[in-house]
């Protein structure tokens, strides 16, 4: 988390909560979407299933509470180099205040820094 709060707070968690509330207020006041990025806690590294969850958001539950939409990117080949899912990135919708949850897989073309829908690369079944 690179942002800092305005006032004196007792912990980084309180500071992140203040920032989160401020971003939410800004979005409402200006009627615009605000995109905020956050690091995950290291808890992901300690467990078997490495897919991120809402509880992995670092330093504050207020990020989860204030957000209308929380999404994660997950690449299995980052943790499992021998996986069959090489270059596949899963876009996970973990929270959606006004819609469904779910995930979609994309092919990540590193040389172009580009995500491409997998349907372009799948062979039709006959």
Q: Where in the sequence are the language-model features?
A:
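C-terminal regions of RecA-like/P-loop NTPase motor modules
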Residues: 9, 21-31, 42-126
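Conserved ATPase-coupling elements of RecA-like P-loop NTPase cores
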Residues: 3-11
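Conserved H-loop
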Residues: 37-39
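Residues immediately C-terminal
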Residues: 1-4, 42
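Non-catalytic scaffold segments within catalytic domains of secreted glycoside hydrolases
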Residues: 14-18
């Amino acid at each position: 988390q690179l942002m800092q709060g305005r006032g004196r707070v007792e912990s980084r968690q309180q500071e992140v909560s203040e920032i989160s509330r401020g971003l939410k207020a800004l979005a409402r006041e200006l009627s615009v979407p605000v995109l905020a990025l956050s690091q995950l806690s290291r808890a992901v590294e300690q467990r078997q299933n490495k897919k991120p969850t809402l509880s992995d958001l670092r330093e504050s539950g207020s990020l989860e509470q204030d957000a209308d939409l929380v999404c994660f990117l997950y690449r299995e080949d980052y943790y499992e180099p021998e996986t069959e899912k090489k270059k596949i990135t899963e876009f996970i919708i973990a929270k959606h205040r006004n819609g469904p949850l779910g995930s979609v897989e994309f092919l990540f073309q590193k040389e172009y820094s580009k995500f491409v829908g997998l349907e372009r690369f799948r062979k039709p079944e006959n």
